[in-house]
Amino acid sequence: MDYKDTLLMPKTDFPMRGNLPNREPEIQGKWEDMDIYSLVQKRTEGRPMFVLHDGPPYANGDIHMGHALNKVLKDFIVRSRSMSGYHAPYVPGWDTHGLPIETALTKNKKVKRKEMTVAEFRKLCEEYAWQQIEGQKAQFKRLGVRGDWENPYVTLKPEFEAQQIKVFGEMAKKGYIYKGKKPVYWSPSSESALAEAEIEYHDKRSPSIYVAFDVKDGKGVLTNGEKIVIWTTTPWTIPANLGIAVHPELEYSVVAAGGARYVMASALIESVAKAIGFEDHEVVQTVKGKDLEHIVAVHPLYGRDSLVMLGEHVTTDAGTGCVHTAPGHGEDDFIIGQKYGLDVLCPVDEKGHMTSEAPGFEGLFYDQANKPITEQLEEKGALLKLDFITHSYPHDWRTKKPTIFRATAQWFASIKDFRDELLEAVKKTKWVPEWGETRLYNMIRDRGDWCISRQRAWGVPIPVFYAENGEPIITDETINHVSELFREHGSNIWFEKEANELLPEGFTHPGSPNGKFTKEQDIMDVWFDSGSSHQAVLEEREDLVRPADLYLEGSDQYRGWFNSSISTAVAVTGKAPYKGVLSHGFALDGEGRKMSKSLGNVVVPAKIMNQFGADILRLWVASVDYQADVRVSDAILKQVAEVYRKIRNTFRFLHGNIADFDPAKDAIAVEDLREVDQYILIKLNSLIEKVKKAYEEYDFAVIYHAVHNFCAIELSSFYMDFAKDVVYIEHADHKDRRSMQTVFYETLLALVKLIAPILPHTADEMWSHFTFVSEKSVQLTDMPETRDIPNAKETEEKFDSFMKLRDDVLKALETARNEKIIGKSSVASLTLYPNEEAKALLSSIKEDVKQLFIVSELAIGGTEADAPEDAQSFETGKIVVAQAEGETCERCRMVSKEIGEDPDHPELCPRCAGIVKTYYQN
């Protein structure tokens, strides 16, 4: 007889190898066929809503690791909420307007922009955006992200644009929208204004100059001919100078040096003297800043007046304490210039070239004008010092080229009238991490008006008409009419029709006696697009609600979407569009460096999915502390793949060992399970509670470690290890075997559900092998519930103590193995000399302790004092390990002196002989 045939070995079709790159697309195909998203929504209908509102990625290019991190985190939350008592719809979105698409067409696609109308160019932009959406959609779906992919929201869709117009109109009605000429961030490389959110800082080398302005009218405080010293790193703005700002409360000195007298802040004399190179100098007069007001100096190049003004923005951090002021090129300059009635002079055009308002420099690119301007200052004797510095300077986030401040006529959203409401809304929102609140609060507190106009083609037009007298027209009637036109035809109609055709029929206005109108040519900042999604998506879609429960984006969105969304929402509704905001860090390479093509360290999601599979990428997301910056590399992914393998192998072992188990008739009631089996269910209860709480708190790394540890420690290295001696060896219906199978079944079912939001492909693959479930997918179930287990606290304490004793036994066996006393642990003979506590513990355990230790012989040999000298000492007592006497049983591989006692089965121990005789002999 072949005794192998009498062993109940595991049987499962669940493969050992994941083969995820090939298997996942098949699983996703099944999800598509069954329309899993709709099935989940139908199942959870009527439950409390949980809405995670998708911040729209920009529709350009392949997805990168930042996208993958973001979408997978969202998917964890939506999936876990729909398994935790909520109705959790997820509508993905795309941001589709703006410069990158224009640039992609004109640069890469060789579109001749100047040879077509605006409307024709915009049609090409729209086509391109849709192509990009399709590409990204396929990549997001490949990640296993579940959502309403057939009905996403897209900012270029007519229904979205129509609602955006309503948001603009409502803000205009409340007086928050105005047109004004003031300095804004201007990108010569994009030929457009930029919002603060579109600025990033990079180091730049700039000239650093000290310039003397001669006093023309000292107002009896200064002497004519004395020189006020300014410092600037933008010589190109000197032609635009109209004034000099000083701080009213600072002390200023007249310093005699080299035959001239110079005016500067007293606190900065030494640093200025050193920078300019005064050999010896002395203070001949001091005066308060406020006494210098209205003094008139002379512009060093043009001889015009330069007025001394008082400004609280002046500091002694650097420079001279006398600040060169060009109202057309700086925010503080503009504000103080308005106060003192100065013109807004801006001698730089949209391409960054000097205009005729800068005589002698017209036509020069502003940066190239620095040198000739400095040379002219030197010729006039006004240049005191030229040097160069490297400093952090604002750049256009798209073109990576420097920006300037440039005064132009722009449309603005003013937040000053509702800033307090905004700050209150920030305080009422739940922020994770908590520092997010401070970050956004300070941004809003310190923020100026928001420049919302852009001088580009691809975007939502600013819905403003102009009367013949130049008066802008924004009324309820015009806004509603334009909104309806956009809903019906899309915003391209604005560029296809004349103003009169876009106005309501019979529209009249006192400013247009001849009935003629023109329309605004600028478009809206793209942040106004996505910032209106709370109205266009949350409010408008029947399956969603405003406010959303959660916005979840990268930490760069405090200045972006989190900011624009709350600004428009509070302006229109008085409330934040979200109850909670969660932010994540950036994806870096394995060494913590930013990914860049030049470094060659870019990790691409598609490559990871082709090599490892989406579930490995998702498990990586679960493993990291995502609220900070996260690292990803081949080596890191290989470590994650090992954890995946452990989880998968656990599934396979548990499933293989319940092949002949029918829960309806074979399950043992929980109170009738052996204590060691109850112990595993108690540990499973703890895991269920821990994992559910972690999903609730978005703490996915806790789940990653908890599930891995449970599989590796409680199951693999303890329970599943000694289980083999029961589930393989005993007869099919043995109570101990059915007891363990009951635990295997409960545990496997719970584990598959617990891990399903993180590893949806693997969980559903395992689910498809279950014969005892009615649902087509694990996604159509809820998180497992904990079981009531009698005397759980006492059982857990008892077996936790036992595990400490077992650790000592394992160490003793390891030492004996190293000393060649034994080979495998299963052939060992153990003699324990336990301390009082361990002795009491051993006598309280009803199970076969020898089986729990997986050894052939076990004896309790009295007290520690009775132990022989060669015994190993541990905290729980002393242990002697020897080779068990006897022969090895052919069937259970344990050593016994009783092998062959049954003459029919001379190779078996009495236990195995009894099983074979009773259950396997005809």
Curated annotation (Swiss-Prot):
Its cofactor is Zn(2+). It is found in: Cytoplasm. Its EC number is 6.1.1.5. Keywords: Aminoacyl-tRNA synthetase, ATP-binding, Cytoplasm, Ligase, Metal-binding, Nucleotide-binding, Protein biosynthesis, Zinc. It is an enzyme of class 6 (ligase). GO terms for cellular component: cytosol. L-isoleucyl-5'-AMP binds at residue 553. ATP binds at residue 597. Zn(2+) binds at residues 889, 892, 909, 912. The keyword Zinc applies. Its main location: cytoplasm. It comes from the Bacteria. InterPro entries: aa-tRNA-synth_I_CS (IPR001412), aa-tRNA-synth_Ia (IPR002300), Anticodon_Ile_BEm (IPR033708), Ile-tRNA-ligase (IPR002301), Ile-tRNA-ligase_type1 (IPR023585), Ile-tRNA_ligase (IPR050081), M/V/L/I-tRNA-synth_anticd-bd (IPR013155), Rossmann-like_a/b/a_fold (IPR014729). One of its GO terms (biological process) is isoleucyl-tRNA aminoacylation. A motif ('HIGH' region) lies at residues 57-67. It catalyses: tRNA(Ile) + L-isoleucine + ATP = L-isoleucyl-tRNA(Ile) + AMP + diphosphate. SUPFAM superfamilies: Anticodon-binding domain of a subclass of class I aminoacyl-tRNA synthetases (SSF47323), Nucleotidylyl transferase (SSF52374), ValRS/IleRS/LeuRS editing domain (SSF50677). One of its GO terms (molecular function) is ATP binding. A motif ('KMSKS' region) lies at residues 594-598. Binds 1 zinc ion per subunit. IleRS has two distinct active sites: one for aminoacylation and one for editing. The misactivated valine is translocated from the active site to the editing site, which sterically excludes the correctly activated isoleucine. The single editing site contains two valyl binding pockets, one specific for each substrate (Val-AMP or Val-tRNA(Ile)). Monomer. Belongs to the class-I aminoacyl-tRNA synthetase family. IleS type 1 subfamily. Catalyzes the attachment of isoleucine to tRNA(Ile). As IleRS can inadvertently accommodate and process structurally similar amino acids such as valine, to avoid such errors it has two additional distinct tRNA(Ile)-dependent editing activities. One activity is designated as 'pretransfer' editing and involves the hydrolysis of activated Val-AMP. The other activity is designated 'posttransfer' editing and involves deacylation of mischarged Val-tRNA(Ile). This is Isoleucine--tRNA ligase. It comes from Bacillus licheniformis (strain ATCC 14580 / DSM 13 / JCM 2505 / CCUG 7422 / NBRC 12200 / NCIMB 9375 / NCTC 10341 / NRRL NRS-1264 / Gibson 46).
